[in-house]
Design a protein with these regions (language model features):
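Charged, amphipathic alpha-helical linkers/stalks
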Residues: 367-426
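Contiguous, structured surface segment used for ligand recognition
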Residues: 29-172
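Single conserved hydrophobic/aromatic residue that forms the stacking wall/gate
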Residues: 529-536
C-alpha cells in the first residue's frame, strides 16, 4: 500500500511541476498594448497653451508615420493630456481620482508625469511646456526619433504600440533653462533657409519659418531657451519680424547677453538676469569666468560651443567634439554651481545632432549620462536612428572616429590660425598651411599610422551602408559617412602633401617607389562617393 501511495505522490508532484512549467509566469512590469489598429486618438483638457497644440500637431504626424493611420483628437482618446496651470477644478479632481501624484510636481517648472490609468495613457504637465514634453516623450517611447524631421529618420511601421504596464514616472528638469544659441549661420543655416524655406533675409539672419522648425526640434529635446548671434549682435533674434511671435507660440524664452557677464532671460514682464559662471575656451574645455563669481553664486549659467568662429581657429564644418568631453565638462560645471542655465552654440542642429542630443539629455536629467556610460548613451542613440543591430556594429567605428578627430580636428589639419578680423585671408600669414606635427620618421611612422586608421575606418562605415534600409541611407550618409569620409579625405590631403614636400629627390620622384607609395594613396573612392551623394541631393 505504501508503495502505491508513494507512486501516487510521485504522480501528483509530476503533474504539479508540469503545470507550473506550462503556465507562463505573471508579468512583472511587462509591456501592454495601448494602441492596436486604426486611428490613434487623444483627449485634451478644455484649455491649454498654444505650445501644447503645437506638440499635439507633431504627435499626430508621429503617430501617422508610425502606424500609417490618422491621429486625431477625440472625447474618448487613448491618450489624455492635461496642463495643470490651466486645468479646471473638475479636471483636477478627475486627476486626483486617478491617483496622479500632483503634489510631487505641480509646482515644478516644465515637469510632467506620464502613466497608465485603465485603458488610457495619461500625460500631465505642470505647465504648457511640461505637457508638450510629456506628449512628445510618448512619441519617443513609441519609436519616433527626435531627429525625425531634421535628420530624415523615418520611423519603422508598427502594427500596435506598447507601453510599460507599470509606467508611472515623474520627470523634472535638472537645469531650469536649457537653450540653444544659433550663430555663424552664414555658412549653413542661412543659405539653407533661403533655398528651402524661401526666407529672403540678409546674410546671417534667420526668420520665423526657420525658427518654427527649430522650436519643434527643441520641444523634442526638452529645451526652452533661444538666443542668436551671441558674439555678433545683442538683439539679432529680435531684429527679424515674426521671430518673437513664433517664440511665444512655442513658449520659448529669449536670452540676450549683457556686457557684465550675465545673461538676460525675457520670460516674464520683468527680465531675469543670470550670472555666467563657466564658459568653454572654444575647444570644449570649461573655464571659470571669475573665481569670485563662482564662490558667491550658487546658481549660474554655463556656455558651451559645439561650433566656433574666431581666433585661434574656427570649426564650422563638422562637429567632432568628443562626447566624453562634453559629458565630463558639463557635469563639472553643474557640480560647481552652473545649474540654472545651459546654453550651447551651434550653427546647424543637424551637423551637431548627437552632441546636441547629449547636451540636452544631460540638461534635462544630469543623472542620465556619466563619463562611464556615455558610450552606451551613444550606442542607444544610434539604435534609435538605425536599429540596435546596426548600432552594435557602428559603435566601435564611431569611437575610433572621435579618437582620431580628438587628436586633430579636420578643420585644424592645416596647423594654422584663422585670420584676424578685417584681414583678407589671401594675405594672411596666419592662414598659411604648415607642416603638421605628425612625423613619418618618429613613433613608428605615426603619420602613416594615422592615415591607415582613417582608411580602415572609412572602409568599415562604407561596408555598413549595405545593411542600412533604403529609406535611411540618406540619414546614414549625413550623420555617419559624411563626417568620417570628409575627415579622412582632409587628413589624406594634408598629410600626403606634407610627405611630398619632404621628398628630397624631386627629379627622381616618379622613379622612386618609396616616394610614390604614400603619394599615390587614392582618394578616388571617397571623392566619388561624396560627389554621388551630393548629386543625388
Amino acid at each position: 500500500m505504501s508503495c502505491i501511495l508513494f507512486t501516487m505522490k510521485q504522480k501528483y508532484i509530476f503533474f504539479c511541476v508540469l503545470f507550473v512549467m506550462l503556465v507562463p509566469p505573471a508579468a512583472k512590469g511587462g509591456n501592454v498594448v495601448w494602441h492596436e489598429g486604426g486611428a490613434v486618438t487623444y483627449t485634451m483638457q478644455s484649455k491649454v497653451s498654444t505650445v501644447v497644440t503645437k506638440a499635439a500637431s507633431l504627435f499626430e504626424d508621429d503617430m501617422k508615420a508610425l502606424t500609417g493611420n490618422e491621429c486625431y483628437e477625440s472625447n474618448q482618446g487613448e491618450v489624455a493630456v492635461y496642463q495643470l496651470d490651466m486645468a479646471s477644478n473638475k479636471e483636477l479632481k478627475a486627476l486626483e481620482m486617478q491617483q496622479v501624484p500632483l503634489l510631487k510636481f505641480i509646482a515644478r517648472k516644465d515637469a510632467f508625469w506620464i502613466g497608465k490609468r485603465g485603458n488610457q495613457v495619461v500625460i500631465v504637465g505642470s505647465n504648457g511646456r511640461g505637457a508638450a514634453y510629456g506628449l512628445l516623450e510618448l512619441s519617443r517611447m513609441s519609436g519616433v526619433s527626435v531627429w525625425k524631421w531634421w535628420g530624415d529618420i523615418v520611423p519603422k511601421r508598427r502594427q500596435h504600440l506598447e507601453i510599460d504596464e507599470n509606467l508611472d514616472k515623474i520627470e523634472v528638469p535638472s537645469v531650469e533653462y536649457r537653450g540653444i544659441n544659433i550663430d555663424d549661420t552664414q555658412w549653413s543655416s542661412g543659405p539653407w533657409a533661403r533655398n528651402y524655406l524661401k526666407e529672403q533675409l540678409s546674410d546671417g539672419l534667420l526668420g520665423p519659418a526657420y525658427y518654427h522648425k527649430l522650436f519643434e526640434l527643441m520641444l523634442r529635446l526638452k529645451a526652452n531657451t533661444i538666443s542668436a548671434g551671441w558674439d555678433k549682435k545683442v538683439s539679432v533674434f529680435l531684429d527679424v519680424k515674426g521671430n518673437r511671435e513664433v517664440a511665444d507660440s512655442f513658449s520659448m524664452i529669449v536670452a540676450t547677453p549683457d556686457h557684465d557677464g550675465t545673461v538676460t532671460l525675457h520670460e516674464h514682464k520683468k527680465p531675469v538676469d543670470i550670472k555666467i559662471l563657466y564658459a568653454d575656451d572654444g575647444y570644449g574645455y570649461m573655464l571659470a569666468r571669475s573665481n569670485d563669481d563662482v564662490k558667491q553664486a550658487s546658481h549660474g549659467a554655463a556656455l558651451y560651443h559645439l561650433s566656433y568662429e574666431g581666433q585661434p581657429h574656427d570649426y564650422l564644418w563638422l562637429c567632432t567634439t568628443q562626447p566624453g568631453l562634453v559629458c565630463s565638462e558639463m557635469q563639472t560645471a553643474y557640480t560647481c554651481g552652473a545649474n540654472r542655465l545651459w546654453l550651447v552654440t551651434i550653427h546647424d542642429p543637424k551637423v551637431a545632432a548627437y552632441q546636441l542630443n547629449l547636451f540636452m539629455d544631460m540638461a534635462w536629467d544630469i543623472r542620465t549620462v556619466t563619463p562611464t556610460t556615455v558610450q552606451q548613451h551613444l550606442q542607444n542613440w544610434l539604435g534609435v536612428q538605425f536599429g540596435k543591430q546596426v548600432a552594435a556594429r557602428l559603435i566601435k567605428p564611431l569611437i575610433t572616429f572621435y579618437r582620431l578627430s580628438g587628436i586633430r580636428r579636420p578643420e585644424f589639419m592645416g596647423w594654422n590660425e584663422a585670420p584676424k578680423a578685417g584681414v583678407n585671408p589671401i594675405f594672411s600669414n596666419e592662414n598659411k598651411v604648415n607642416n603638421t606635427d605628425f612625423s613619418a620618421e618618429e613613433f613608428g611612422n605615426e603619420l602613416e599610422r594615422y592615415l591607415n586608421n582613417y582608411d580602415s575606418l572609412s572602409l568599415s562605415v562604407l561596408k555598413l551602408e549595405d545593411v542600412i534600409p533604403d529609406n535611411l541611407k540618406g540619414s546614414y550618409f549625413a550623420m555617419v559617412e559624411y563626417p568620417i569620409m570628409s575627415s579622412a579625405a582632409m587628413a589624406t590631403k594634408i598629410l600626403q602633401a606634407q610627405e611630398a614636400r619632404h621628398i628630397g629627390r624631386i627629379a627622381s620622384f616618379h622613379h622612386d617607389r618609396e616616394a610614390l607609395e604614400p603619394a599615390a594613396r587614392s582618394v578616388t573612392v571617397s571623392y566619388t562617393h561624396l560627389r554621388a551623394h551630393e548629386t543625388d541631393s
